[in-house]
């Protein structure tokens, strides 16, 4: 039996600035068992796990985000979300169970 890769790299179907498009794409792939971890300019890396029903939210941030990121991540955590990665260090990716 062939062993399946745990990390998958996919070409992003929309611009990294199309946050609604990326959120929908990430949610669709989570249903197939691929969970976003990191993105580059054109590609996104996913970790393979059991399929799940997640909703994603991209929150804009800037390159000087350390304090802001800590505060924002804590606010999202209290609301039931967890940080899942980032897009170009311009957006923080949050995920929550649908």
Locate the predicted segments by residue.
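Terminus-proximal functional modules
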Residues: 1-98
């Amino acid at each position: 039996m062939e062993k399946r890769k745990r990390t998958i790299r996919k070409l992003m179907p929309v611009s990294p600035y199309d946050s609604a498009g990326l959120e929908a794409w990430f949610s669709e792939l989570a249903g197939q068992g691929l969970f976003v971890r990191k993105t580059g300019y054109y590609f996104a890396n996913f970790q393979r796990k059991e399929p799940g029903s997640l909703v994603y939210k991209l929150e804009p941030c800037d390159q000087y985000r350390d304090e802001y990121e800590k505060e924002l991540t804590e606010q999202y955590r209290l609301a039931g979300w967890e940080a899942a990665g980032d897009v170009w260090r311009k957006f923080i990716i949050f995920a929550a169970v649908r």
